[in-house]
Amino acid sequence: MTNIREDENIFMFLCEKWILINKNHIWNRINQRINIIADFDRYQRARTISEGQRTENIHRNIYGAVPYDYNLVNLTSTQRNPLGYINASVAEFPEIGRHYIITGAAQDTQIPFFWQMVFEQKSPAIVMLLEDVELGIEKSDKYFPNNTREELKFGIYDITCKEFVKRNILEYRLLEVSVGNETHQVHHYKFHGWTEFNLPKYEDFMAFYNTMKEVGVPLLAVMKNNCMSSFFKKYHHTPPTNAPIIQCSTGGARCGVFIIIDILINLIDNRIKNSYSIEWWMLKVRSKRNHSALTNQQHSFIYDIIIKYIRTRHNQLRHLEKYLEAHANTVRMIDSTNTEDVDKFIKPRDWIVDFDERDRLIGKLQFRKRLKIEKDQVSEQKLVHLKSQLHLFQDTYKYESYVLQ
């Protein structure tokens, strides 16, 4: 059974933060600050992008998106790709034991290298967050068989489809990659209805996300320590990460949105202590993948998904939203030109809400609501007693929990 108190705290924090951002109309300003902080961090840590800018590699990039050098996926050198370059980044989050490979759409001549990456990295899953064609623009070339009757070959890699399931917005395939006598199976999930120009509905996104859990292996493999295997075997490529591959048109914003949502849901499900600051995780993802800035709408979408996810787990929490709105109205307006004010929405330790003060106000509003309900049901003497309690409560009383009140 889930711990409702822990979920309740996360729900209250994110819901009121979302209310305050909307109230102050500062989505754009927050994202501007995130971009500035991310760029400063990039230059301070000297995160270069020279490998992707080399003459031999630049044609392998998608829409000009060039990845960082420090976390590139390196392939075994081949005659066609002597530098072993692929536009893909290993995004590791050791503090929570999670990792991903982020990459862009499969482009014709680069498809053999994509499957080389899948095979060498032993990736358990591919999450495809793009359509082949979006608003008349071709985004991805065909790189996998459509059904169990079809087989494809890219270079030395034979790709067969062992299972195929289609459910509204989801296509699932169990694919097998073969090189000689060696094989590797990978779960392929394709999401329909999420393009560069729109956002999916909560119901569609969660149907896709939950189906991934039901159909195959868990999307996320816990990070494995490759130090020992690397010690005993000299790899000519990045040692196998066993990381799932997250794929959108450029390996940018949609991948970032999906990863942040996936991380937060896993933190919630496993009751892991965390700041649960969406903006902090946006910065973390930006540090792993260049060109992964989110739009205001994508930023807000993450809030919408996580708030609704918690509310779905505990439907009674919906009653808190009106109280959180009431408290948000007592919080001073934010000066969007004041960098220090805006940064309070980004840095977890600088949050502007006094939780104790918020709890007292919500408790008082709930007490008054109960008092109003009881007015017609109690004697005059009881009403006097209840009112005296209310007077005392205004200075001293605080609810320990707001659910079921």
UniProtKB/Swiss-Prot annotation:
Summary of the knockout phenotype:
Moderate increase in constitutive dauer larva formation at 27 degrees Celsius. Increases constitutive dauer larva formation at 25 degrees Celsius in akt-1 mg306, age-1 hx546 or pdk-1 sa709 mutant backgrounds. Normal lifespan.
What is the membrane topology here? Answer: Peripheral membrane protein
Q: What is its EC number?
A: 3.1.3.48
Its protein name is: Tyrosine-protein phosphatase non-receptor type eak-6
Q: Give the record's GO CC terms.
A: cytoplasm; plasma membrane
* SS bond partners: none
The primary site where this protein sits is cytoplasm
- Enumerate the catalysed reactions: O-phospho-L-tyrosyl-[protein] + H2O = L-tyrosyl-[protein] + phosphate
Q: What does this protein do?
A: Putative phosphatase which, together with eak-4 and sdf-9, negatively regulates dauer larva formation downstream of insulin-like receptor daf-2 and in parallel of age-1, pdk-1 and akt-1.
Which family is this protein grouped under? Belongs to the protein-tyrosine phosphatase family.
Organism for this UniProt entry: Caenorhabditis elegans
**Biological process annotations from GO:** dauer larval development; signal transduction
The Tyrosine-protein phosphatase domain, residue ranges: 30-309
Ordered alphabetically, the record's keywords are: Cell membrane, Cytoplasm, Hydrolase, Membrane, Protein phosphatase
| Single GO term (MF) | phosphoprotein phosphatase activity
Please tell me in which tissues this protein is expressed.
Expressed in the 2 embryonic head hypodermal cells XXXL/R.
Q: Which residue positions are annotated as catalytic? A: C248 (phosphocysteine intermediate)
Q: Which InterPro entries match?
A: Prot-tyrosine_phosphatase-like, Protein-Tyr_Phosphatase, PTP_cat, Tyr_Pase_cat, Tyr_Pase_dom
Localization, per the record, is: Cytoplasm; Cell membrane
Q: Which domain of life is it from?
A: Eukaryota
